[in-house]
Swiss-Prot record:
It comes from Chlamydomonas reinhardtii (Chlamydomonas smithii). One of its GO terms (cellular component) is ribonucleoprotein complex. Belongs to the eukaryotic ribosomal protein eL42 family. This is Large ribosomal subunit protein eL42. Keywords: Antibiotic resistance, Cycloheximide resistance, Ribonucleoprotein, Ribosomal protein. GO terms for biological process: response to antibiotic; response to cycloheximide; translation. GO terms for molecular function: structural constituent of ribosome. SUPFAM superfamilies: Zn-binding ribosomal proteins.
Length: 99
């Protein structure tokens, strides 16, 4: 279980010093319909003949690498930071209590 605080002090390239950053999890954007590969694929798929390219089935990984998107609260500049793989990820969860 990885628990990351909602705000974090980190170096900002815009301000050129350590600032408070707002932390969110990076999500992949929607794939464009007009990218060259998608246009080529759609052209090949159209007409008779069924599936033209192999459909990938051999999934090897069970987790994804976590990417944090950090935004400076002063200048709004963003930067990404990659983390290791983990099954459970949480932003701003309760802290673990010590003994």
């Amino acid at each position: 279980m990885v628990n990351v605080p909602k705000t974090k002090r980190a170096f900002c390239k815009g301000c050129k010093k350590h600032m408070m950053m707002k932390v969110t999890q990076y999500k992949t954007g929607k794939a464009s319909l007009y990218a060259q590969g998608k246009r080529r694929y759609d052209r090949k798929q159209s007409g008779y003949g069924g599936q033209t390219k192999p459909v990938f089935h051999k999934k090897a990984k069970t987790t994804k690498k976590i990417v944090l998107r950090m935004q400076c609260q002063e200048c709004k500049q963003t930067c990404m930071k990659g983390l290791k793989r983990c099954k459970h990820f949480e932003i701003g969860g309760d802290k673990k209590k010590g003994n």
